[in-house]
Amino acid sequence: MVIATKFGIVRQAGTYERRIDNSPAYIRAACEASLQRLGVEQIDLYYCHRRDAAVPIEEVVGAMAELVRAGKVKAIGLSEVSADTLRRAHAVHPIAALQSEYSLFTREPETDVLPACRELGTAFVAYSPLGRAMLTGALDTAKLEAGDFRANNPRFQGEAAAANAALVEQLGALAREWGLTPAQLALAWMLARQPHAIPIPGTRRIARLEENLAAARWR
């Protein structure tokens, strides 16, 4: 088991307003707080969740590297950064993983981030590999609740939602030809196209977890 956690997004108590903090002092404090909450002596993978443009990436990674040298963190990662930022960060300390959204719907990382990861030996961790559930074929965008963040995402609204649903129907038809679910085909596509990518689909049910894991047999 690998324990990964993040720092960078700070929620204001009471109001839940968010701000981004990449200051070295906050990085150290957040690490100590995570160690205490998790009840461990070392974090396997420590991510910078979001970049604070006011703090140079070299300073951010330098602070993270100090935690590695102190034995509090085993490896460090970044989330949602450009290929250039990844290279600058890697020049300070090896970056074990870069997390970014990637799926059949979201292909931007193929342009330069994925090649940079291959070049540097950095694992690419793909979040929302099922397009925030759209690629499962089971999501009804008309029934999204008001508190669901997807309700405010253009991808799930109006004509875009209808167009995406039509694409998912085609995905489902192709999946059935192979005896797969739409989710399994979407994951198998990623594993075949990007062998070094690690998809992290979220789920609340064991049955869905088992369904997703079975996709690895079809890469």
Residue ranges and their predicted role:
Residues 35-53:
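Active-site groove signature of glycoside hydrolases
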Residues 12-19, 141-147:
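Short, glycine- and charge-enriched coil/turn segments that flank and shape catalytic ligand pockets
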Residues 13-28, 49-54:
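Active-site mouth loops of central-metabolism enzymes
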